[in-house]
């Protein structure tokens, strides 16, 4: 079975700290981003807003060295296990999942 990309040629990527197992972020990758990740050992993604490839930490220095890549049972999602340098989130938080949903109010 092959990886199952969506109609836009993307696959969701969950990124997790290899040591702590903390979930750091959710992003998307296309085939080229996955190939670059495998070739370089550093996480590459597809930016849906900018519509271009990006190496995580390219400007901030907060790179992700990929230790292992796993795929799920349906071959439609990836898990990058990484060594995170600095913070993963553009807000300055270590993880993008730093807020808790309580009640019915969501502030984005």
UniProtKB/Swiss-Prot annotation:
Pfam families per UniProt: PRA-CH
Protein name, entry field: Phosphoribosyl-AMP cyclohydrolase
Group of enzyme by EC: hydrolase
GO biological process entries: L-histidine biosynthetic process
Domain of life: Archaea
Family: Belongs to the PRA-CH family.
Function: Catalyzes the hydrolysis of the adenine ring of phosphoribosyl-AMP.
Assigned GO CC terms: cytoplasm
Binding site for Zn(2+): 73, 89, 96
Keywords, sorted A to Z: Amino-acid biosynthesis, Cytoplasm, Histidine biosynthesis, Hydrolase, Magnesium, Metal-binding, Zinc
Metabolic or biological pathway: Amino-acid biosynthesis; L-histidine biosynthesis; L-histidine from 5-phospho-alpha-D-ribose 1-diphosphate: step 3/9
EC number from the UniProt entry: 3.5.4.19
NCBIfam families recorded: PRK00051.1
List of residues binding Mg(2+): 72, 74, 76
GO molecular function: magnesium ion binding; phosphoribosyl-AMP cyclohydrolase activity; zinc ion binding
Cofactor: Mg(2+); Zn(2+)
Cell location: Cytoplasm
Subunit structure: Homodimer.
Catalysed reactions, semicolon-separated: 1-(5-phospho-beta-D-ribosyl)-5'-AMP + H2O = 1-(5-phospho-beta-D-ribosyl)-5-[(5-phospho-beta-D-ribosylamino)methylideneamino]imidazole-4-carboxamide
């Amino acid at each position: 079975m092959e990886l199952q990309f969506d109609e836009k040629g993307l696959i969701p990527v969950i990124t997790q700290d290899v040591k702590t197992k903390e979930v750091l972020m959710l992003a998307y990758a296309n085939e080229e981003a996955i190939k670059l990740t495998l070739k370089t050992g550093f996480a590459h993604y597809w930016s849906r807003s900018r519509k271009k490839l990006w190496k995580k930490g390219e400007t901030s220095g907060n790179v992700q060295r990929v230790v292992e890549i796993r795929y799920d049972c349906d071959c439609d999602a990836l898990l990058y296990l990484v060594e995170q340098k600095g913070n993963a989130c553009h807000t300055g938080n270590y993880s993008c999942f730093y807020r808790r949903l309580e009640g019915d109010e969501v502030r984005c």
